[in-house]
Amino acid sequence: MANTHSAKKATRKITRRTAVNKSRRTLMRGSVRIVEEAIAKGDRDAAIQAMKRAEPELMRAGQQNIVHKNSASRKVSRLTHRIAKLAK
């Protein structure tokens, strides 16, 4: 249990930030899942549209340290590559 005033405040702050980060992480994962489902169905147009919504979410999560920025970039790259393979 936090004893000092500043430690109590830090605990409240951590709780708020955790809630925000969980929400953003859930949004990011959901958008990625939609892209992956479209790829699994083989629906290239739906995958492209979903990717247009997912890429900004991933990059924003990387900028805000919800995930590491390289992880976000890697995820975007791999999804884009998989969508490109659908055209062939």
Swiss-Prot record:
Record key words, sorted: Ribonucleoprotein, Ribosomal protein, RNA-binding, rRNA-binding
GO BP terms: translation
Recorded GO CC terms: cytosol; small ribosomal subunit
Pfam families: Ribosomal_S20p (PF01649)
Region of interest (Disordered), ranges: 1-20
Domain of life: Bacteria
Ribonucleoprotein recorded as keyword: yes
Disulfide feature: none
Example GO molecular function: structural constituent of ribosome
Record flagged with keyword tRNA processing: no
Comp. bias (Basic residues): 1-16
InterPro entries noted in UniProt: Ribosomal_bS20, Ribosomal_bS20_sf
Reported function: Binds directly to 16S ribosomal RNA.
Family: Belongs to the bacterial ribosomal protein bS20 family.
Name of the featured protein: Small ribosomal subunit protein bS20
